[in-house]
Amino acid sequence: MTNTETAVFGMGCFWSAEELFRKIKGVISTEVGFMGGTVKNPTYGQVCRGKSGHIEVVNITYNPKIVKYTDLLNLFWNNHDPTTPNRQGWDVGEQYSSHIFYFTEEQRLLAEKSFEKIQKSSDLRIVTAIKKASDFFPAEEYHQKYFMKKNNSILNF
């Protein structure tokens, strides 16, 4: 297997985020799930009821020789609204908040640098949280590759 790295982003509904990233050249795999909460192995229901503190995230395994972490960050920033706390479009709740979870010091620094750049270009306050990655809990199978399974052509990234 090639040298791979992992990126995890929370940017609203994880179905849309996964659909965006899974199509990128250099992305080896994607998986939707939850990160950042206090309950071990939360269910989708627990997360949606606000009982676990988790964020809906997409877990991305990628080849850094083909796609850079900064490229993934740019996709993250350009495909959701980082100025709305606990909300993306019609989806409202803590689980939909904007998050970058980092695994390495380099990822943290790149995330913070990108945050500063976005903040300087915005009249609104950026509310994206940048946090050290914690345990990732995969969502139930029916959430995985949701739009691919549904053959939904509504999303055109």
UniProtKB/Swiss-Prot annotation:
| Any one Gene Ontology molecular-function term assigned to this protein's record | peptide-methionine (S)-S-oxide reductase activity
List the InterPro entries hit by this protein, alphabetically. Answer: Met_Sox_Rdtase_MsrA_dom, Met_Sox_Rdtase_MsrA_sf
Q: Does the keyword Oxidoreductase apply?
A: yes
Question: What chemistry does it catalyse, as a reaction equation?
Answer: L-methionyl-[protein] + [thioredoxin]-disulfide + H2O = L-methionyl-(S)-S-oxide-[protein] + [thioredoxin]-dithiol; [thioredoxin]-disulfide + L-methionine + H2O = L-methionine (S)-S-oxide + [thioredoxin]-dithiol
Q: What is its EC number?
A: 1.8.4.11
Show the active-site residues: 13
Q: Name one Pfam family in it.
A: PMSR
> Which keywords annotate this record?
Oxidoreductase
A single GO BP: protein modification process
How would you classify this enzyme at the top EC level?
oxidoreductase
What this protein is reported to do is described as: Has an important function as a repair enzyme for proteins that have been inactivated by oxidation. Catalyzes the reversible oxidation-reduction of methionine sulfoxide in proteins to methionine.
What PANTHER family does the record tag this protein with? PEPTIDE METHIONINE SULFOXIDE REDUCTASE, PEPTIDE METHIONINE SULFOXIDE REDUCTASE MSRA 2
Q: What family does this chain come from, according to its entry?
A: Belongs to the MsrA Met sulfoxide reductase family.
Q: What is this protein called?
A: Peptide methionine sulfoxide reductase MsrA
